[in-house]
Swiss-Prot record:
PROSITE patterns reported for this sequence: PFKB_KINASES_2
Catalytic activity entry: alpha-D-ribose 1-phosphate + ADP = alpha-D-ribose 1,5-bisphosphate + AMP + H(+)
Family: Belongs to the carbohydrate kinase PfkB family.
pH dependence of activity: High levels of activity within a broad pH range of 5.0-8.0.
GO biological process: phosphate-containing compound metabolic process
Organism, as annotated: Thermococcus kodakarensis (strain ATCC BAA-918 / JCM 12380 / KOD1) (Pyrococcus kodakaraensis (strain KOD1))
InterPro entries cross-referenced by the UniProt entry: ADP-R1P_Kinase, Carboh/pur_kinase_PfkB_CS, PfkB_dom, Ribo/fructo_kinase, Ribokinase-like
Name of protein: ADP-dependent ribose-1-phosphate kinase
Residues that hold ADP according to the record: T200, L201, N202, G203, G204, G205
Amino acid sequence: MKLDVIGIGNLNYDIIFTLERFPEFHEKINARGAHFGLGGAAANTISWLAHFGLKTGYIGAVGNDDVGEMHIKYFQGIGVDTGGIDVVEEPSGVAVAMVAGDDKRIVKYPGANLRRRFKPEYASRAKFLHLSSNPPELIEEAVNFASQRGIKVSLDIGEAPLPRELESKVDYLMMNEDEYRRKYGSLDPSLCRAKNLVVTLNGGGALVREGDNVFEVRGLSAKVVDSTGAGDSFDAGVIYGVLNGWSLLDSAKLGMLLAYLTVQKVGARSAIVPLEEVKRIAREVGLDLPFNRT
């Protein structure tokens, strides 16, 4: 079966503590709240897209443990093809986050994620590959494969290195402002060789380059409870839009809406809702998107 999108990335178990303040050295404090849930950047993105009715799959690795079983059952429950997920003899990955106001500290145990490998035969079923939180060698293999096969690829690069010759093969490069400035020395979008570029800005909003055309997308004002997964939700909006033939500008607007929903709840996937609900919220906040145009 042909799939619309295959995600490639980590599969983690997220533990999020909300705090009044961070503990001092050797101090023990009580958390104000605790959230436990499934995570992993590309997995969060794919979860949105599956809820939107796209045919999705995933390449990753989990442990032969309860957490690994939870990941597979969750994906199967929302219609994500799990044929690209390996079950290995390593504990599943875990991420622990402490959130105090606008500040956040994260500790990760990669575990089974380190055993993830690219699967060309499985990936060939996709119209579109989305990569996030991957090692450089897997990024290179996947991007080259997609380029040779005519498969569109989006890459949320994070801090991973990206050779210039590989960069030009990426259809949609996604970064935040800090990552972009560290890599290119300024916010000039012309410095990037990717075919299209989306940079989320520190003050909210995003800078979008579609071919040679550059736009700025305004963010939506929200009371931030927890920013975990907001970037992953943004990526989902961009991917959904471009797969449906939208401009990158409109696609980024949808990404902003999904990020807006995400930051108002604790946990990366707590805000996921069906597409019809997203359409309703878009109308409610006055966001003009193609699926609401008559």
